[in-house]
């Protein structure tokens, strides 16, 4: 029998302290990593429930273990809410992550050795879109497309030519570092021309899609995948969506279980259901509109300060800051901003002369600061502070500038707490 009066801080003070330190970091640092966000207390509450105790291999109504009648209800709610939220005919809410969702789609629609056409990691794609170090580049014949280095935009003619040349079994559309709107229909047309499946990975923009501020790929692609965190602001996990196709739906279910996973995480699935319900509210739609407005304000301010943005601006939640030609690297900028309590991530940019571990760019995103309550004014101020730090790296006065900016960050974070 468990003693429910026993406390974590008393039993395991080391882990407790790590949790408290991270909570303090989240409150006192400005989070600009484009893939990060703060989830709601209700989502976190669900993840800490007794649902974590239940094994539920299989799907609702078709489990391998007994005692699943209540977790069946939770998963059925998550499935129906996901379908309603995204206008999908099919949803699988069991993938533990976005990468595992993508892996399941590859397994369902392709065979090892098949050709897959995806966006290069160096140009803004994801590891699972064919990178050589990923399963997608090791198990499949990965052909990579990129962006036009002059415009910073996806080159659809290049994609069409590569598709005609290599005849891929599947084309992957989506990104982890691209600031413009992808034309899902153009990808569909290219896929149809060469007889390929079209998979869209909308992990970065799923929240924007749910709110109607970014075009939906769900009824255009054969299969759409996403994480449930990032802009969607739910728990860490994955999801697979599709338009009606019984044959593909059966393959997808089998690829997730038993093909790639065993028991689903029922406490996380319940949290996913909560986040989908949150995403149906008017407040959530207003939040996503503000995410884009804040990103546009930041991009415009970078441009005004003479800091180049790849593609010139943004139409979503993120932007790539191009530091090619600067005396400092993306790694240097990342570290300096981190010392000022501004968290970003170094990122490769098109034609980057530096290694992926050093880079000549930064990726910046607004989902987390918008959750804090930042509007355009705070984001403009923040961008100016970032530019001050970057300029100080060239002017030799970075120590004082970083200290000044850190003080401003602490003040604005106190004014806009994450969790009241």
From Swiss-Prot:
Its main location: cytoplasm. Homodimer. It comes from Saccharophagus degradans (strain 2-40 / ATCC 43961 / DSM 17024). PANTHER family: SERINE HYDROXYMETHYLTRANSFERASE. It is found in: Cytoplasm. This is Serine hydroxymethyltransferase. Belongs to the SHMT family. Catalyzes the reversible interconversion of serine and glycine with tetrahydrofolate (THF) serving as the one-carbon carrier. This reaction serves as the major source of one-carbon groups required for the biosynthesis of purines, thymidylate, methionine, and other important biomolecules. Also exhibits THF-independent aldolase activity toward beta-hydroxyamino acids, producing glycine and aldehydes, via a retro-aldol mechanism. SUPFAM superfamilies: PLP-dependent transferases. Pathway: One-carbon metabolism; tetrahydrofolate interconversion; Amino-acid biosynthesis; glycine biosynthesis; glycine from L-serine: step 1/1. Keywords: Amino-acid biosynthesis, Cytoplasm, One-carbon metabolism, Pyridoxal phosphate, Transferase.
